[in-house]
Amino acid sequence: MSGMYGALTVGALGVSNNIGGLTTSWHSGMLDGASALISQNRGAGKYRRTLQLFLWLMAVDVMIGVLGLVLVSAGLPWLAAVFAQSKNHYDPAFCEMIVSIHRWEMLGYITLGINSATLALLLGYGYTKLTLLLNVARVFLFRVPVLWFFQRFTEMGMEAVGITMMVSNICAGVSAIAVVIPVLVRIRKKIRQEETCGKTLDK
């Protein structure tokens, strides 16, 4: 759909995604390792530890998002210039496009961290359908319809692509919070049951 704004916009969006990957790839790496740890502890009945792992992961992912936002905000013009430079040619228009798109997209770094931590917990507890729902919603509910709206009902230019990415990434984090709250309530119930059983056995 971004092709509506021209081939150069598609290229700029690809570069913007690559720049975003400097931060979000850390989230992905944490997700893979943490989901396995959460699953192992859940299998051992150590529900309190799974909750602790999730909270630590959430804190780390949010810090990564904040750090990424600060660093990329400071270095975005330079990063864009690197990607806009070929062997014998520098394209200032392409560089400006990259900056225009990513200055919006990067505002979702923190909420993507929240989304990543939530997915780790859901995968660790075997909530694969909820995980799929969040991933599908991010693209087909929060991204495609938003870009379609901008293209049909506004005069916004290629900057709409960056705003769409921002909306999609922020909504992904908000929806993850909405999904994870009832899951956390269930885990807390299991912890209380575990502690009650332990006290009964001690008696």
Regions found by a protein language model. Name each.
Residues A12-L76, L112-T131:
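Small-residue-rich hydrophobic transmembrane alpha-helices
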Residues I38-G108, Q151-K203:
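Short alpha-helical transmembrane segments in multi-pass integral membrane proteins
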Residues V139, R143-G157:
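Hydrophobic alpha-helical transmembrane segments of integral membrane proteins
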